[in-house]
Amino acid sequence: MMKKKQKKNKKNFNINQTSFYFEDYLETNKKNKIFKNSYISQDRVYLLFFLFFSLILIFAIKITFLSLKNPKNYIYKNNITQFTALRRDIIDRNDVLISRNIKSYHAAINPSLIKDKDNFLIKIRINFPNLPIELIEKKINKGKYFYLKKRLNQNEKEKLWALGEKALIFEPFQSRIYTHGNLYSHILGQVDYDNYGISGVEKYFDKSLKNKELLNKPLKLTLDTNIQYTISSELNHAMKIFRATGGGALLMDVNNGEVLSLVSLPNFDINKREKIVDKKYINKITKGVYELGSIFKTFTVALAIEKNLVSPDTIIENIPKKIKCSRHEISDIKEFPKAMSVQDILVRSSNIGTLMIAQKIGEQDYKDFIKKTNLLSIPEFELEELGTPLSFKWNKCKLETISYGHGIAITPLQATATYAALTNGGNVIKPTIIRKEELKDNKKIVSSETSQKINSILRKVVTEKEGTASLANIYGYDVGGKTGTSQNYGNDKENLNTFISVFPSQDPKYVLLVMLENPQVASNLIYNYRGMKIKGTRNEAGWNSVYIAGKIIEKIGPILAIKNEEFYNKHVAK
């Protein structure tokens, strides 16, 4: 009897019913008041489920949108690799490594994993006494994940690891290191914490340096680390001797514009990722804009010779001691003869003599020369930090003052490139730190004949008794050049001393600019001046910038493999 009853009440199971037992039960008892309320509750469950699912969907869409918009801002906090950009190596002309990405770590703290806070803080204080323990404790008390220290070096990472604290999380990332510290600070620039270039070469070539297809091919610069180190050391030494507030140097190949060295002082260690805001740290060679003084006299003389208005031997007569131009009185720093040759005017560096040559040229031709040399345009160079030459109006006396380098402010980079063109046969070149097949722009600013004459005069600036650059007459290197002593633009209490040299002057290969900001008389320095030992008593460029340029050329000459026949015949051949 019992078996038959069970068989009678049995119902067939429908596989398509999603809630068979529940629905069947409700169907049977729908009219019951208690179960009627249960039926209403089911609708509420569906509604709550729908709202919860909608919120989850909205949140997921928002996270996806934000991560796509700026993926580098989203990192995993549970010891998973941070997504930082890989970058190519940077090497110098001799394949010396100067920048590379390495695997490094950030140290973070997960407060929820700390078992004994006091003991944890004691460990941190003992091993890292410079970290702000009070601030760390406040952050721990908030209970949120935070960074203890970013960009750990290997020693710091090992010390933290040895603490054995689970709350310490190590996030791996790609760190950019610069193998020579501050040596290339104004050239290489820096990257941010996500390895995106923010200054210098790192910013200018950012896209190329992040190119995945080129990761195994280093970016090769024209710089020479040995020469960069030598020039930087000598310039640092000079700043101490002459108590200068700043300095700069630039060495360039006169024939193709390749920059072998670029130094700006003071510099800074680019591995420290410090925010540099003090203007004393600007790149003085490419960003600084200065009145460079008498180095402009070479431009004036070259243009006059090119226009066949004068020759090096042309005598300029009736040179006055002073000239009044508009409201300004122009004079020389010392008394010169009333009649001098064009060559002597440049060798002795006469303002008034140069002014009289410029008047022969005329304003329009001088304008055309400046335009052809791009001296008033932003320079073309593979760095982000480029200065803008100051614009001016060609009013009365402008031609006269520009002729000797006052009233016109440009970058040292532009001045050096123009000297390269004047001495390489007249060919305009584009300065570069990247080797390229074609660097000349096929323009000439002067003829080969004019260029040869200028080289001859620049050599005499160094060798002649009345020349202003005798201290650069380095045995065997045939140095020529021109000095410039001027006041800093906008502050007549500060001075800038510059020397641009070319060597060997008979067939120039290199041009070297050396500049010192606010140098003082080095009264304790003993100069070897024309075979005599004398103490320093003067403060013009000929007594500081020229002196240090000579020291630099003497040391880098062998590195550049310049054939020093005098030295060879005297010390090697015998």
Where are the language model's segments positioned?
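Beta-lactam-recognizing serine transpeptidase/beta-lactamase-like catalytic domain environment
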Residues: 25-26, 97-99, 249, 253-294, ...
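Periplasmic/cell-envelope proteins involved in peptidoglycan metabolism and beta-lactam response
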Residues: 1-273, 364-374, 524-574
